[in-house]
Amino acid sequence: MKVTVNGVEYSFALNSFAPTYTYEVIMGEPFSGATTRNIHVMMFATLLASNPDEWKMTLAQFTEWLYDHPAEEQTMASAISDEFIRRAELSLKKKKE
């Protein structure tokens, strides 16, 4: 999917492990989704991993931007949730086979 931040369109791709790996480098722990902070850092990690040459915002700048853009925050949070639900369902399906 695409996300527009400060008038620039960026890819927001959760179809690889790159966002998760980037999250783990930033946070020093696996993603749990248990806190708003976890989710916001995953959003940042996804944008950074999806746009390695274009993304220039710091995490602090991004969280300030998020505060003023709740609709975009919700869209990205839903995409993250949907992807982790999809992964969990695939894992359960594999266990049943």
Across the structure, where does each feature detected by a protein language model lie?
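Short, hydrophobic/amphipathic alpha-helical patches that form generic packing surfaces
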Residues: 39-49
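Charged interaction scaffolds used for protein-protein
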Residues: 1-9, 17-34, 51-97
